[in-house]
């Protein structure tokens, strides 16, 4: 079974994980829109430079599908946010050719991509939510009623990599930094956890891995420690059953005492996946069963707890052609 990881960026470790799996006997291809992406130059069988998906989605999909047919790719794994909605819309085109694209349906992707839509989904399904406001006016009204006060936390509705997010300590600063594409939230202090929730082809959770996140870098997990936590496990099972995503979901949960808040959803393998994999949860190894609609046994503790994973700075040098 051949796999293509699209827009791999710096996530060459995904190739290494696949190649190290004794049960995997196919080829691994990688692509990116940047020929200097480090993930192109590693253990992959072949790499390809394609156009940026957002520049012209139709041309990108045509070229990607043509490449997959030529190389007999069985599974496409996207790993960056901007590409996910584009592939979700084109998922059936690939399926007609026998190619599984590892993305959820468009509705799930839209919920995950927009903080406002995510919050609406959480409220409608009875999940606990951090106090959130879409406008300065609604925030001021709540503040006047002593429901919330500074400091607050602002973030982009469609933000990625924590761009624009941060703590705001005064109304003057809020008016300066806030724009219509943002939300304002209570600045809840608690422990942050990253959770990998893997659903099978029937859209039911079969694997869950919980990690404490002591360090982040540019919105991505830099250090993580695997843990067992029943309260987070039950919340994650409920989320997986309710959201009904397909395959991997990278979820961030903030825990304050007995309260637990879902603060971010990414319908893909996230930056914290290496911590899950290196602790024994080989979610990549489940993809062949997912592709063939085969049953996957439920195991919510298919990993070792207390495993600390840290990202290091690796170096590569390759010969390039220049004008």
Question: What is each residue range found by the language model?
Answer:
Residues 71, 228-323:
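ATP-dependent carboxylate activation and anion-phosphoryl transfer catalytic cores
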Residues 95-164:
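A conserved helix-loop-beta module that forms one wall/lid of the active-site cleft
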Residues 118-123, 184, 236, 287:
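Structural element of the ATP-grasp superfamily
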Residues 163-244, 254-255, 259-261:
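Phosphate-binding site of ATP-dependent enzymes
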Residues 5, 27-32, 133, 152-153, ...:
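Short, hydrophobic beta-strand segments that form beta-sheet elements in well-ordered domains
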